[in-house]
Swiss-Prot record:
Lineage per the UniProt record: Eukaryota, Metazoa, Chordata, Craniata, Vertebrata
Name the UniProt record assigns to this protein: Interferon-stimulated 20 kDa exonuclease-like 2
Residues in the signal sequence: none
Purpose of the protein: 3'-> 5'-exoribonuclease involved in ribosome biogenesis in the processing of the 12S pre-rRNA. Displays a strong specificity for a 3'-end containing a free hydroxyl group.
Bias (Polar residues) ranges: 152-172
Ranges annotated as biased composition (Basic residues): 24-35, 135-151
Chain positions covered by the region annotation Disordered: 1-93, 125-172
Length: 353
């Protein structure tokens, strides 16, 4: 980088006032005075009155450095000189007055660098003012304010709209979402074994996972184990849970939930329990399920037939008897085929308990 040349003349200048610099410097001074009048530039933040010397300038003989990085020249007897733009009182001609602003005109790159340095000095002298936001910043701030001040577009605007949306989303949302399926196996008690008593109970959740599966000892003597259908044998009753204890455990699971079953009234009768009709789903009396199986709507179809027709699966086969876990899982899968349609029907025609 080439050094700047300073042409100094210590002779007597002409009596007329020295020029204040080129057009760019005059424009700079004009803007600085405007900022001073408006209060943006205080005296404390004004650039130094003396023309700053570049760091590349060597110190002259007799000069001493000061705190602000300039070099102090010893004072000499004052002479009558014309007022210069830097107010130093030294006789400077036009070239000397603007030498720190105008670099050597030999190279264009040096001129651009000098202008950048000048702009940096001017900006550093200005007080810190909040800069105006750009377009992108304005847009982002407007979006943030709109999100805070206005409700979301997807949110319902009033209670009527919210009610209509909830109605369209399905009646199943208004009912308890916890749903279980139950199946019970009975044995014969009483005279000639005509009384059906609970001997095994299985409960599965919505996904078919087993929540409860226990053998239950009836309070009365077992006359007929009905092994061909129930799968219950004498050895199953050795460590079976007493009916009273098992009933309390089962009702604790069923309370407050939607209970699905096939011919479920028989299971509730064996449990000596009444479940609300609004929370009961009996797959033996669901017309849409019969329609899917190409059966008469009002006919009572067996669980085995519906499972084979709709799930393409065989259950209750062999001579070992039924599995209450398998039957409960099949019942839940059948109900899930018509769940949305049947829940909407029940919402329009709620059953009375």
């Amino acid at each position: 980088m080439s050094t700047l040349l300073l042409n100094l003349d210590f002779g007597e200048p002409p009596p007329k006032k020295a020029l204040e610099g080129n057009a760019k410097h005059r424009n700079f001074v004009k803007k600085r005075r405007l900022l001073e009048r408006r209060g943006f530039l205080s005296k404390k933040n004004q650039p130094p009155s003396k023309a700053p010397k570049l760091h590349s300038e060597p110190s002259k003989k007799g000069e001493t450095p000061t705190v602000d990085g300039t070099w102090k020249t010893p004072s000499f007897p004052k002479k009558k000189t014309a007022a210069s733009s830097n107010g130093s009182g030294q006789p400077l001609d036009k070239k000397a007055a603007v030498s720190w602003l105008t670099p050597a005109p030999s190279k264009k790159a040096d001129s651009v660098a000098a202008k950048v340095d000048l702009l940096g000095e001017f900006q550093s002298a200005l007080p810190k003012i909040n800069s105006h936001p750009t377009r992108s910043q304005k847009k982002s701030s407007q979006k943030k304010s709109s999100k805070k001040n206005h409700p979301q577009k997807n949110a319902p605007q009033n209670s009527t709209q919210a009610h209509s949306e909830n109605k369209c989303s399905g009646a199943s949302q208004k009912l308890p979402r916890k749903m279980v399926a139950i199946d019970c196996e009975m044995v014969g008690t009483g005279p000639k074994g005509h009384v059906s008593s609970l001997a095994r109970c299985s409960i599965v959740n919505y996904n078919g996972d087993v929540l409860y599966d226990e053998y239950i000892l009836p309070p009365c003597h077992i006359v007929d184990y009905r092994t061909r259908w129930s799968g219950i044998r004498k050895q199953h009753m050795v460590n079976a849970t007493p009916f009273k204890i098992a009933r309390g455990q089962i009702l604790k699971i069923l309370t407050g939930k939607i209970v699905v079953g096939h011919a479920i009234h028989n299971d509730f009768k064996a449990l000596q329990y009444f479940h609300p009709k609004s929370l009961t789903r009996d797959t033996s009396h669901i017309p849409p399920l019969n329609r899917k199986a190409d059966c008469p709507e009002n006919a009572t179809m067996s669980l085995k037939h519906l499972t084979k027709k709709l799930l393409n699966r065989d259950i209750q086969v062999g001579k070992s008897g039924h599995s209450s876990v398998e039957d409960a899982q099949a019942t839940m899968e059948l109900y899930k085929l018509v769940e949305v349609e049947w829940e909407e029907h029940l919402a329009r025609n709620p059953p009375t308990d």
